[in-house]
């Protein structure tokens, strides 16, 4: 166990210092904004320092572990730890939250509560990614939903309460299945609850029971990822939420579902994952094509970007189902890559709305001349969304593509068919991306009238846009920087499935053998 509680400090620091924001002057909006921004920067620096000096990349085991007895009544521990799978999402969370705080600068109504909720969400997300106890993971998962619901219901468009209610109904429904899975796994085969991830990774279950647990977790994570048909909350939520909240949703919240699939479904329930992985690949391929073909029909700019996010999540699903180290590395890289791309697109959509007060594409046009900086940034980021070579999306999707082609788990013809469907989705992506640019920036609309003048992107908006663009370019040029974080852990996860294939005939009373 680690001698110094680095992770506890990282988890608690945002919400603890954020609660002090209510002691600041009520009318001091600038003071609150700078205070929140400083907290996010300090948290990001602390996280970076901890990982740089206390984390070993070549070790696939859990590091910086902390284990404190919390509730003695049912043996509940405060267990934290990180490995190659969680370090990337944690750093992504810090980076996106810091920029989202800067993006929320124009928010003035109930600014104290708004910034506190962002910091509370920050703590919940880092807690979910660093939890090594199943019940603690569930508590952090649920805790994070409270600030998200309040951010959605109090700031945004006219239908924000409807979208927030839809979001909480979907996620609360998924949380019921998550709780059932947590209690089922924790209470199975023992008089006392077993909730430690390391212990549960060595636990064996009857096949039917493992499948039931897997389905429960899959439904919970499918809502958050989202996986069709449990995706309908996402376009409505993005369409009404404030764009800084959209940055957090697209950049971090969706990735929690993918993280849960790998952390729990793949690691703790490998036999059931072998059974369900072909279905995941089929659903992922369908999702890529469905969302990419639905996106061009969306006139609301933010809903169109939301459907593009759903399409890109299909690549993550296929990578997780590929059961290959190349495919899983591609899925993890897509988690990081789309975190930057999705956050950047929603930020630019929000800044354009701040200027023209329009969200529907059929009302726009001719914005390239009055808003050249916005036009340039959105054009570059749209290219990254359609996986232009040299940008992060290209490397991630290429790895997933090769991962499914080179997977040893599937026959040749199904792999060719899935690759063909993925290629169709890649072809459809430029259709909605380029048509969005054409409708916004080209043509002859109201913005070409001489009497109309709009302020282009200012220093704050350019800083946020460039800060999101640089990692996209950096990962596209040198993807090993991100892949090196998770490659050892991915090999350890995938090796379990090959080990299982070698000894799967050795079963006793319907239970699988020990996989690790």
Curated annotation (Swiss-Prot):
Family the UniProt entry places it in: Belongs to the complex I subunit 4 family.
Phylogenetic lineage: Eukaryota, Viridiplantae, Streptophyta, Embryophyta, Tracheophyta
Q: What is this protein called?
A: NAD(P)H-quinone oxidoreductase chain 4, chloroplastic
- Can you tell me where the transmembrane regions are? 4-24, 37-57, 87-107, 111-131, 134-154, 167-187, 208-228, 242-262, 272-292, 305-325, 330-350, 386-406, 416-436, 462-482
Under InterPro entries, the record lists:
NADH_Q_OxRdtase_chain4, NADH_Q_OxRdtase_chainM/4, NADH_UbQ_OxRdtase, ND/Mrp_TM
GO process annotations (BP): ATP synthesis coupled electron transport; electron transport coupled proton transport
Any Pfam family: Proton_antipo_M
Q: How does it sit in the membrane?
A: Multi-pass membrane protein
The protein's organism comes out as Oenothera argillicola (Appalachian evening primrose)
The protein's matches in NCBIfam families, at most eight in alphabetical order, are given as: NDH_I_M (TIGR01972)
Q: EC number(s) per UniProt?
A: 7.1.1.-
């Amino acid at each position: 166990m680690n001698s110094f509680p680095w992770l506890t400090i990282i988890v608690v620091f945002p919400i603890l210092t954020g609660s002090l924001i209510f002691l600041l002057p009520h009318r001091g909006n600038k003071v609150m904004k700078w205070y929140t921004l400083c907290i996010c920067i300090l948290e990001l620096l602390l996280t970076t320092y901890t990982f740089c000096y206390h984390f070993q990349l070549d070790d696939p085991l859990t590091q910086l572990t902390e284990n404190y007895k919390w509730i003695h009544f049912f043996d509940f521990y405060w267990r934290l730890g990180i490995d190659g799978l969680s370090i990337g999402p944690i750093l992504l969370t810090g980076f996106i939250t810091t920029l989202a705080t800067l993006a929320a600068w124009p928010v003035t109504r109930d600014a104290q509560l708004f910034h506190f909720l962002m910091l509370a969400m920050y703590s919940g997300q880092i807690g979910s990614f660093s939890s090594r106890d199943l019940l603690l993971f569930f508590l952090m998962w649920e805790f994070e939903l409270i600030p998200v619901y309040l951010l959605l219901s109090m700031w945004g468009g006219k239908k924000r309460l409807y979208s927030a209610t839809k979001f909480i109904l979907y996620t609360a429904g998924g949380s019921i299945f998550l709780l059932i899975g947590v209690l089922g796994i924790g209470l199975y085969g023992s008089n006392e609850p077993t909730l430690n991830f390391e212990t549960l990774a060595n636990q064996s279950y009857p096949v039917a029971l493992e499948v039931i647990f897997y389905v429960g977790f899959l439904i919970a994570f499918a809502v958050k990822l989202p996986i069709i048909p449990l995706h309908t909350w996402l376009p409505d939520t993005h369409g009404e939420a404030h764009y800084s909240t959209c940055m957090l949703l697209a950049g971090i919240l969706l990735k929690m579902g993918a993280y849960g699939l790998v952390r729990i479904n793949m690691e703790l329930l490998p036999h059931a994952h072998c059974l369900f992985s072909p279905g995941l690949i089929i659903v992922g391929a369908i999702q890529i094509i469905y969302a990419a073909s639905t996106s061009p029909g969306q006139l609301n700019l933010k809903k169109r970007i939301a459907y593009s996010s759903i399409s890109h999540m299909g690549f993550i699903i296929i990578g997780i189902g590929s059961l290959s180290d190349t495919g899983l590395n591609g899925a993890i890289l897509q988690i990081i890559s789309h975190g930057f791309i999705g956050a950047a697109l929603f930020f630019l959509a929000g800044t354009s709305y701040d200027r023209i007060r329009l969200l529907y594409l059929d009302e726009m046009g001719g914005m390239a001349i009055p808003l050249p900086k916005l036009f340039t940034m959105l054009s570059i980021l749209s290219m990254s969304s359609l996986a232009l070579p040299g940008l992060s999306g290209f490397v991630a999707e290429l790895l997933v593509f090769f991962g499914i082609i080179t997977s040893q788990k599937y026959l040749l013809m199904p792999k060719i068919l899935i690759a063909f469907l993925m290629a169709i989705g890649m072809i459809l992506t430029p259709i909605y991306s380029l048509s969005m640019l054409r409708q916004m920036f080209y043509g002859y609309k109201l913005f070409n009238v001489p009497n109309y003048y709009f302020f282009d992107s200012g220093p704050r908006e350019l800083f946020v846009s460039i800060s999101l663009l640089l990692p996209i370019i950096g990962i596209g040029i040198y993807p090993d920087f991100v892949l090196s974080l998770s490659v050892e852990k991915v090999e350890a996860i995938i090796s379990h499935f090959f080990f299982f294939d070698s000894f799967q005939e050795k079963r006793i009373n319907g239970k699988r053998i020990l996989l690790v």
